[in-house]
Amino acid sequence: MKNTLGRLLASILGAAAAAPAFCQEAIPEHPALRDRFYFAAGMFFPRTTTSAELESRSGVGANIDFENTLGMKESKDVPMAMARWRSGNRWRFEAEYFQMNRSGDKTVDRTINWGEQTFPVNSTVSSKFDFSDLRLSAGYSFFRTKDKEVGVGIGAHVAAYNATLSGTFNGAPIGNQTEKVTAPLPVLSFYSQFALTDRWAVAGRMDRFALKYDKFSGNLTGIGLDVMYQPFKNVGFGLGSRALALKMSAEDEGRKAEFKQTFQGPVLYVNASF
């Protein structure tokens, strides 16, 4: 009996000693939260709305809807890429990039004023609108465990615009005008990442910016959501969503340029981490 009780007590003590190790092993460890380097490349499938205004030096200008007025497509599949580097246990540095170039041709039913160019009713207007966004961020995870992290970051969305309008009227060329604007928009970011299992994880991020200074004003809101599946040690897959809304206005050489744009759609990518 004593031997039986001794064996039972030894078993209980052994199980109690093994319990913390078992619980520790049960905590999921996903590569997205563990690996120091993370790279991804894939496709972004956004729907977009675009409006812009470029005043002449005399102050004449009108807001133009590039999709409805100038015949640009509302959606286009574009490549995207992102990278992350973890420095220590709590710091992380990220970059994400996409570029969307579009063009359109349409006979307009109203007068279009774009900078110093005027396109009268029934003229054929050819438009080109190129946009790129480079997101840079340095984040600090104030809450960090093996399977969870929540943090804040500072960074910038470097938004670059290149818009050109040209046209003809009754077969005769009217002229063209191009406006280029590149603006690094500083943002405050909030992010989180959670491992569901050793292979599945979810992540979320929100960027926010608002500034009015001298002859510049702008605001930006960006949201990113991701579901990540990594069946291999160094290779995985991701499905997510991106939403970006921005508005900026700047005055230069007596002319005011204003851009307002939204992007929203799914992303699909392959990632490598180590």
Model segments located where?
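Cleavable N-terminal export/targeting peptides
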Residues: M1-R34
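Short glycine/proline- and aromatic-enriched beta-strand/turn motifs that initiate or cap beta-hairpins
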Residues: C23-M100, V267-S273
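Residues on the lipid-exposed face of transmembrane beta-strands in outer-membrane beta-barrel proteins
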Residues: A41-M43, A81-W85, A95, L136-Y140, ...
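Extracellular/periplasm-exposed beta-strand and loop segments of Gram-negative cell-envelope proteins
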Residues: T49-D77, Q99-S132, A159-A183, L211-K215, ...
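Repeated loop/turn-to-beta-strand initiation elements of outer-membrane beta-barrel proteins
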Residues: R90-F93, K146-K148, D198-V202, N234-F237
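Early exported N-terminus immediately downstream of N-terminal targeting peptides
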Residues: Y97, K148-A159
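Outer-membrane beta-barrel transmembrane domain signature
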Residues: H157-K233, L244-K247, F274
